[in-house]
Amino acid sequence: MEIQNNLYGIDLYTILPESILIFCLLTTLIIDLSLDSKNKSWIIYLNTIGLILSGLFLCLQWNGIIPVTPFPSFKGDSFSIAFRFCIIIASLLSLLLSIDYIKRAGVQLMEFVIFLLGATIGGMFLCGANDLITIFTSLECLGLSSYLLAGYSKQDIRSNEAAMKYLLVGGASSAILAYGFSWLYGLSGGKIILSEIVDGLIFADFVNPLIKWITLTCIIVGLGFKISAVPFHQWTPDVYEGSPTPVVAFLSVASKTAGLALTIRIIATIFPYLENEWQFLLQILACLTMIVGNLVAITQTSMKRMLAYSSISQAGYLMIGIISSTNDGYASSLVYMLIYIFMNLGAFGCVILFGLRTGTDQIRDFSGLYLKDPWLASCLTIFLLSLGGIPPFAGFFGKIYLFWSGWQAGLYILTFVGLLTSVISIYYYLRIIKIMFVREAKEFSSYVKNYVIPVNSLLPQSSVETAMIVCMIASSVMGIAINPIIQVAQKTILSTIPFI
């Protein structure tokens, strides 16, 4: 019998990176059930190698020939490859950030790895999903794994509460999005492939505009929950505060990356054929997201909640590139998302390391950290300055490219709001830096006074430090090499958007 290289309309080579991770997931499950706990630590290396191999195959596929299939439910184009690669980076760094934390917490490492791989696989499929069924299935795979990760610390009441809130809000947002998809299915004459839906919408001009507005609103609300846009952000601070810190680090970048890829694909493909006013609606959401996220972040006393509201504001910046609906706009969102992964995971890495040594994440407890642990304080300073958009770090150039693309697209008010709120964000980032660099011993927090000074070494002492070093180098070097990165992003978008 002839061996087919196509399964349900998906070229098998296209999903080879996901297949590697599925193999790692199944292997981890089998080993977890068959071996004693003391013999399972090496499985971390297997999954790390699997993530690296998956990323390498994505690099080999980039800018290659896009497979043509009879039922293209999944697209392996350069656009999806770029975002899937970002998710691989986020997962790999999150795994490194998690190992020491989980060992200290005394919970099952294998379960965490299984949930992490499940979320990674769901996010990667979501980046290339090209029909309504695949989109919703991938979204639920990512969502269910994320809910389990949020409630991973079963003995922690806050973690259980975070998982419950995340489940309820995530389920509601998925239901709203599915309702919007059902209207889209009807308007297009029963089509589920995105390109075929567009063909159906072209001939749906006779439909009542109210129905189109209902469809548009439901989809925007559903996507808004996924990327934590205001006013659909209420779940984010509570879930971030209650979930284990490594889980928060992963959710803050991986789910946002997958949500951004889905949003761009739907907006570039379908929205122009629904209503012309969608840009105005998204501009209002983007302005609210940037303003609320940054203003509320100023009042926070917990590093995790502060980074949660910072993550909300970053979603507003990313929306500038999406709303511009230009090649440079989409490319700027991709570039900033890649930079954001490193600087945000690096900041969370510092919070994790400080928490492992002190047991707290309150901002005031970082007081005087520089004199006790200058390396950790310097790393956190670099990440916060990059998040604030201070040169010469990568975050500055990423924001400049975003704002430039918005200005070129005529989004003057939105760009001005972005610049203004970016200046506001510098205040609360610098406030934390100022607290760390106090020199008076009487101003030191009790946690810093009892801080165990680590052994000085040129080599990282833990997986958390390894991930932090990678993020710190990336946050610094990417600012210097920003032009090649922008060129790669532009090439990715130019080769994809006409066929997205």
UniProtKB/Swiss-Prot annotation:
One of the record's GO cellular component terms = chloroplast thylakoid membrane
Q: Which organism is it from?
A: Chaetosphaeridium globosum
Family statement: Belongs to the complex I subunit 2 family.
What reaction does this enzyme carry out catalytically? a plastoquinone + NADH + (n+1) H(+)(in) = a plastoquinol + NAD(+) + n H(+)(out); a plastoquinone + NADPH + (n+1) H(+)(in) = a plastoquinol + NADP(+) + n H(+)(out)
Q: Which residues cross the membrane?
A: 15-35, 42-62, 79-99, 109-129, 132-152, 167-187, 201-221, 247-267, 278-298, 306-326, 334-354, 377-397, 400-420
Q: What is the E.C. number?
A: 7.1.1.-
Q: Which GO terms describe its biological process?
A: ATP synthesis coupled electron transport; photosynthesis, light reaction
UniProt protein name: NAD(P)H-quinone oxidoreductase subunit 2, chloroplastic
> Does this UniProt record's set of keywords contain Isomerase?
no
Role of this protein: NDH shuttles electrons from NAD(P)H:plastoquinone, via FMN and iron-sulfur (Fe-S) centers, to quinones in the photosynthetic chain and possibly in a chloroplast respiratory chain. The immediate electron acceptor for the enzyme in this species is believed to be plastoquinone. Couples the redox reaction to proton translocation, and thus conserves the redox energy in a proton gradient.
**A Pfam family matched by this chain, by name?**
Proton_antipo_M
Compartment(s) where it occurs, according to its Swiss-Prot or TrEMBL record: Plastid, Chloroplast thylakoid membrane
Quaternary context: NDH is composed of at least 16 different subunits, 5 of which are encoded in the nucleus.
Report the membrane topology from the UniProt record.
Multi-pass membrane protein
The first-level EC class reads: translocase
Q: What keywords would UniProt list here?
A: Chloroplast, Membrane, NAD, NADP, Plastid, Plastoquinone, Quinone, Thylakoid, Translocase, Transmembrane, Transmembrane helix, Transport
The source's superkingdom equals: Eukaryota
Question: What does the record give under GO molecular function?
Answer: NADH dehydrogenase (ubiquinone) activity; quinone binding
Is the S-adenosyl-L-methionine keyword given for this protein? no
